[in-house]
Amino acid sequence: MEETMINAAIDPVKTGENIREAMNHKNLTVRDITLALGLSTPNAVYKWLRGDTIPSIDNIYALSLLLDSSLDELIAGRVVL
């Protein structure tokens, strides 16, 4: 049987857009997210929203709880077979 390799990755730009949309839906600001996640500065949140980086697994889980969104709703992936 031939093995198929799956090349999967998280799309940081689309993930950031999903986070921003969920924040807007809940009327939460970057400051609200920063405080709720116990971050020392809002820099990480801005980087997520711009698609420069993606949240750690702990932070994306916390965001899903805070934003009442599933991980699937927040994380945007791309798969190349």
Regions found by a protein language model. Give the residues of each.
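Short, basic-rich loop-to-helix N-cap that marks the start of a DNA-contacting helix
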Residues: G51-A62, L81
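Short alpha-helical "recognition helix" segments of helix-turn-helix
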Residues: I33-T34, L63
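DNA major-groove recognition helix of helix-turn-helix/homeodomain DNA-binding modules
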Residues: D58-E73
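Residues within the alpha-helical elements of helix-turn-helix
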Residues: H25, A36-L37, L66
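A short, Lys/Arg-rich alpha-helix, primarily the initiator
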Residues: M1-L28
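Short amphipathic recognition helices of helix-turn-helix/homeodomain-type DNA-binding modules
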Residues: E73-L81
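Short coil turns linking two alpha-helices in DNA-binding domains
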Residues: T29, S40-T41, S56, S70
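Recognition helix of helix-turn-helix/homeodomain-like DNA-binding domains
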Residues: L39-I54, G77
